[in-house]
């Protein structure tokens, strides 16, 4: 599913990733943990083709993306990878349903099909009755679930999440954490989650520990 080999990355004189080798299989829920500055977010961004490594090879869902041009990468990213961040980044002028549909529009999915897909996912997440509400009418937990639904709309093979529950209270954290496993079981996606949350790391299928740009 995800294969990284010899990944290095530097910013100026600071080497952030120091030869990362990593294999993640289809359907795994994997957490990446480590102290601040360990390189977790940089690794996730490279895994998601949002940034490029200085050296190394990246294979995602059977495709070597290492040599792709930006236009190819953008199309690949929109189809194969979903992203969830700490802050939901929903567009305030659109409803929950419309926010979820945006990546489908970018991918050229017809409006009717995009709407049906979005409503199916929102229904699965218990948000069907909130579909017509705008972000300022939703709770923090609801907004983050809408963001997860948006990440799923194009049926990507992998979901990459960076501190997805970092801004939530304990109850909403637990609900979101369980949601990742429910989604994996329902849709079969692979989840890679950068987190400082020990409770989440403990329940993932595998935990990857990073220190100073290395996996230990």
Swiss-Prot record:
Molecular function via GO: ATP binding; ATP hydrolysis activity
Gene3D superfamilies given in the database record: P-loop containing nucleotide triphosphate hydrolases (3.40.50.300)
SMART domains: AAA (SM00382)
Topology in membrane: Peripheral membrane protein
The ABC transporter domain, residue ranges: 2-216
Quaternary structure (record): The complex is composed of two ATP-binding proteins (LolD) and two transmembrane proteins (LolC and LolE).
Name this polypeptide is given: Lipoprotein-releasing system ATP-binding protein LolD
Native organism: Bacteroides fragilis (strain YCH46)
Gene: lolD
